């Protein structure tokens, strides 16, 4: 599935269907499509035009993040393996629920740790449902954010025209810094994203 990643001038609002990928905002560590039943296993980003300033890509290993959480917040690990509510960004049929429940971490069939990192979608999911975060849930999300904020746990990668970045979407989290575009429309930041799966149906929901 192909998608153009560029700033459209839209602004984020829970339930609106507007995703950070069509804005220029700082996009924290996440796994693409975490709010879907079957997120893609791999994400590819082709750079057509980089930003004038910012838009730096950051990548963090899920195993590294998980180990840091186990070391620093062992009392919260059980909560991270229980479901959270995610905003589905209006990517569903009319009449379907606007939120999706899933744990942030799970063990794959091969024993590896897989993730659904998407803190903004989780906060928006609870807002859409009119539910307040209980103390344990709020503490768990804050703990994950604290790990995201550790620069030594991730790598930074710039983009140049023609470069392609491939990441394992369930084994790594990726992020993007806020960016400023060139004033000329033809020079604005533009990436083309490709989602890939090894299994499941060919449609969006897999």
Residue map of PLM features:
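Active-site environment of non-heme Fe oxygenases that use a 2-His-1-carboxylate facial triad
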Residues: 2-166, 170-206
């Amino acid at each position: 599935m192909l998608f153009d990643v560029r700033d459209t001038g839209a602004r984020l609002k829970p339930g609106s269907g507007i995703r950070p990928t069509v804005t220029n905002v700082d996009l924290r560590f996440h796994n693409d499509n975490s709010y879907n039943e079957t997120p893609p296993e791999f994400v590819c980003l082709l750079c057509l035009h980089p930003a004038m300033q910012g838009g730096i890509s950051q990548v963090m290993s899920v195993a590294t993040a998980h180990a840091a959480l186990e070391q620093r917040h062992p009392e919260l690990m059980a909560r991270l393996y229980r479901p959270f509510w995610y905003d589905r960004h209006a990517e569903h049929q009319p009449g379907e629920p606007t939120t999706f429940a899933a744990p942030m971490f799970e063990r794959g069939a091969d024993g590896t740790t897989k993730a659904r990192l998407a803190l903004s979608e989780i906060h928006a999911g609870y807002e859409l449902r009119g539910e307040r975060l209980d103390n344990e849930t709020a503490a768990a999300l804050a703990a994950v954010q604290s790990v995201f904020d550790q620069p030594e746990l991730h790598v930074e990668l710039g983009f140049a025209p023609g470069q392609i970045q491939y990441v394992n979407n369930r084994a790594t989290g990726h992020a993007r810094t806020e960016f400023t575009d060139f004033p000329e429309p033809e020079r604005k930041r533009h990436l083309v994203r490709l989602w890939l799966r090894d299994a499941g149906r060919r449609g969006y929901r897999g």
